[in-house]
Amino acid sequence: MKKLKITLVKSPIGYKYDQKDTVKRLGLRKLNSTVIKEDVPQVRGMIRKVRHLVKVEEIEE
């Protein structure tokens, strides 16, 4: 199954609360932190909401 490597590349400071909350729920805490998540529609929706703050790469595992 595909997985997504998600990296926080821009700080959520100054953005709406729901965007900050989405970053937190993705598991991203500090700038340049990276998490690996399953490629499911729920995660894709969260990424779409904060696409201006994160970098996403598809990986095979």
Curated annotation (Swiss-Prot):
Disulfide bonds, paired cysteine numbers: none
InterPro entries reported in the protein's UniProt record: Ribo_uL30_ferredoxin-like_sf, Ribosomal_uL30_bac-type, Ribosomal_uL30_CS, Ribosomal_uL30_ferredoxin-like
One term of GO molecular function: structural constituent of ribosome
Organism: Thermosipho melanesiensis (strain DSM 12029 / CIP 104789 / BI429)
The entry's keywords: Ribonucleoprotein, Ribosomal protein
Name the record gives this protein: Large ribosomal subunit protein uL30
Family the entry assigns: Belongs to the universal ribosomal protein uL30 family.
Subunit composition and interactions: Part of the 50S ribosomal subunit.
GO CC annotation, single: cytosolic large ribosomal subunit
Name of the gene: rpmD
Pfam family, one: Ribosomal_L30
GO biological process, one term: translation
HAMAP family: Ribosomal_uL30_B (MF_01371_B)
SUPFAM superfamilies per the UniProt record, alphabetical: Ribosomal protein L30p/L7e
